[in-house]
Amino acid sequence: MRIAVDAMGGDYAPEEIIKGALLAHRQLRVGIALVGRPDSLKPFLPQPLPAGITIVPAEEDVGMAEEPLMVRKKPKASINISMQQVRSNQADAVVAAGNTGAAMAAAYLNLGRLAGIDRPAIGALLPTLKGKPVLLLDVGANVDCRPRFLEQFARMGSLYCQCVLGIEKPRVGLLNIGEEPNKGNDLALATHQRLAQLPGIHFAGNAEGRDVLTGEFDVVVCDGFVGNALLKFAESVGQVITQVLREELPRGWRGKLGCWLLRPNLKQVKRRMDYVEYGGALLLGVNGICVITHGSSKAPMVYHAIRLAKEAAEQKILQRLQAEMVDPREPESNPRRRTRPLQVYSGSGPEVLPLGSLERTSSRCPEPVEDAQP
């Protein structure tokens, strides 16, 4: 198992990215390909390199503030080289921190979409009261959606829960403002009708915002605009509760004693609510395993992102998606079975990324400048 890691992406790159990658290498026993400028990476790496760690050179990187389409203007950027590691079968998955739009664009340009998928979706795992995660998608890849897109999100999410989380019959919910089938806007109404008639998934009806973290649903689908707002709100909940406990519990000698007695329990509460434990979000619908994590990721979150990528690769989620995502209701001649351009939103509005438009000098990735020591 080998994971390609864009070591130049994120606010704390490359130091924190490398720390997390080295931790994953030691604890998960997985090979790591660190992609970036060698002169920037080497100061943070042990010498000689541990067995299983390689450096793959990249001349450029795409910054957090740059437009997603910079991946097309920078064909030798680390995010592109990382995706090409997967495309050429030199890596089983890729982990990228930093510019989410750039990571999505690079994945599409280098890996392409799966047949039967109109729009890839970003799926994030969130903690629930029942101790099992819920998969929320889309959380930012598509701010405007059609009912057909949400139907595909539901199918991909259900397959992920079956393959990776081991849930035999995942309960799929549609995020809405009410439980009744006649609630919601035009998108919600049309999507509800499609999901209710969709074979192969267990559609459990509408999910209100208060239902997402209860554990009643295994998959919750929505458009990327709503999903991204909900994701960031959910991530803040744990931080707010932790901060309130830190401020209120130590007040007075009784509070200090209570803190000492409850310390193991409080640590467990923090662990259950900490989004860092879930590592990142999977980009489902592209022809490769890609995990996108926060631009503010430090070593622990990078470690968990690599763990998430490893689990997805081991459970062969990509092969299941490749085999089952083509809609049997659509004839072979339907253009939706073939790859079409993808819109990526930038500061100047939506722009089209045609597959294959990225300049490539070779069909293979650069060879590592330093191989692992035997």
From Swiss-Prot:
GO cellular component: cytoplasm
rRNA processing as UniProt keyword: no
Location, primary (coarse class): cytoplasm
The organism's taxonomic lineage, starting at the top: Bacteria, Bacillati, Cyanobacteriota, Cyanophyceae, Synechococcales
Similarity field: Belongs to the PlsX family.
Signal peptide: none
Pathway terms, separated by semicolons: Lipid metabolism; phospholipid metabolism
Protein name: Phosphate acyltransferase
